[in-house]
């Protein structure tokens, strides 16, 4: 009788332990997923400027110099201003960017990153203190090694001349393309770059 009760007690304890572990496993899995839930703004800051947690996810493919500039006091101030402008000018954009990334669709991501560059140019045109330059720069200009759509924001200096200060931040989209081809305009290369970006974010 005692041995039966003991066995029953052990079975009960093991059952409780197993269900507890399963519960903890689900909880930790959910927490991990929640930790990788980002807003459209998080994606924007991370992919274009290497800021925040998204920036850290793709940090191995970032140019340290540009990340430093983007995360400087001046850089953060400039990016904050850009984000504020976009939210006012195109309130739906950040949600659209998030949807394109969450859907893991490279083509949609390409569309939204191209739109991001257009919005940044629009911001620069409306801001007297900031200039936008589309000049191509060296192959080490930012994310993934070569610029697809090179763009820099410059804070206007005292003499109203566009200067490349610590606040000059790259708006280039996929430089990863160089690893596949010398042609940055090739659609298949752009899709490969977008797919790599999505993989890094969703790993």
UniProtKB/Swiss-Prot annotation:
Induction: By Spo0A during nutrient starvation, through its direct negative control of AbrB. Repressed by AbrB during regular growth when nutrients are plentiful, in association with the transcriptional repressor Abh. Protein not detected during exponential growth, accumulates during stationary phase (at protein level). This is Sporulation delaying protein C. It is found in: Secreted. GO terms for molecular function: toxin activity. Disruption phenotype: When the sdpA-sdpB-sdpC operon is deleted, increased rate of spore formation; a double operon deletion (sdpA-sdpC plus skfA-skfH) makes spores even faster. In a single gene deletion no SDP is produced. It comes from Bacillus subtilis (strain 168). Its main location: secreted. One of its GO terms (biological process) is cell killing. Production of active SDP (able to induce SdpI and kill cells) is a multi-step process that requires signal peptide cleavage (probably by SipS or SipT) as well as SdpA and SdpB. The disulfide bond is not required for maximum toxicity. Keywords: Antibiotic, Antimicrobial, Bacteriocin, Disulfide bond, Secreted, Signal, Toxin, Virulence. Residues 33-140, 183-203 form a propeptide. One of its GO terms (cellular component) is extracellular region.
């Amino acid at each position: 009788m005692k041995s039966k009760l003991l066995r029953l007690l052990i079975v009960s304890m093991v059952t409780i332990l197993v269900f507890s572990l399963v519960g903890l496993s689900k909880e930790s899995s959910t927490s991990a997923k929640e930790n990788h839930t980002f807003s459209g703004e998080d994606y924007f800051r991370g992919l274009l400027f290497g800021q925040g947690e998204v920036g850290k996810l793709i940090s191995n493919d970032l140019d340290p110099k540009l990340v430093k500039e983007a995360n400087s006091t001046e850089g953060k101030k400039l990016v904050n201003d850009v984000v504020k402008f976009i939210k006012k000018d195109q309130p739906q954009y950040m949600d659209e960017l998030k949807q394109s990334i969450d859907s893991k669709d490279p083509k949609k991501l390409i569309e939204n990153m191209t739109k991001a560059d257009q919005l940044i140019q629009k911001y620069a045109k409306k801001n007297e203190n900031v200039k936008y330059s589309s000049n191509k720069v060296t192959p080490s200009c930012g994310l993934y090694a070569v610029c697809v759509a090179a763009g820099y924001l410059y804070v206007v200096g005292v003499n109203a001349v566009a200067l490349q200060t610590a606040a000059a931040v790259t708006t280039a989209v996929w430089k990863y393309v160089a690893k596949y081809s010398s042609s940055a305009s090739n659609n298949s290369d752009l899709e490969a770059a977008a797919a790599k970006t999505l993989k890094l974010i969703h790993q």
